[in-house]
From Swiss-Prot:
Entry keywords, A to Z: Chloroplast, Membrane, Photosynthesis, Photosystem II, Plastid, Reaction center, Thylakoid, Transmembrane, Transmembrane helix
Statement: the UniProt record of this protein carries the keyword Chloroplast: yes
InterPro entries hit by this protein: PSII_PsbK (IPR003687), PSII_PsbK_sf (IPR037270)
SUPFAM superfamilies to which the protein is assigned, alphabetical: Photosystem II reaction center protein K, PsbK (SSF161037)
Protein name: Photosystem II reaction center protein K
PANTHER family hit by this protein: PHOTOSYSTEM II REACTION CENTER PROTEIN K (PTHR35325:SF1), PTHR35325
Organism from which the protein derives: Pelargonium hortorum
Length: 61
């Protein structure tokens, strides 16, 4: 269980800070998309959490 928690923490840390260190800025014409691009790395985590919500809805059958 601790390994899953560590993986999630590392994923969130890299998702929050990687855009400022490893990637350049978007071109000026696409600057209005910056908020969306900042959230995009976290989207797979939402699907991961959705799997648990779905299983809870069907009582973990």
């Amino acid at each position: 269980m601790i390994n899953i928690f560590s993986f999630i923490c590392i994923y969130l840390h890299s998702a929050l800070y990687s855009s400022s260190f490893f990637f350049g800025k978007l071109p000026e014409a696409y600057a209005f998309l910056n908020p969306i691009v900042d959230v995009m790395p976290v989207i797979p985590l939402f699907f991961f959490l959705l799997a648990f919500v779905w299983q809870a809805a069907v009582s973990f059958r």
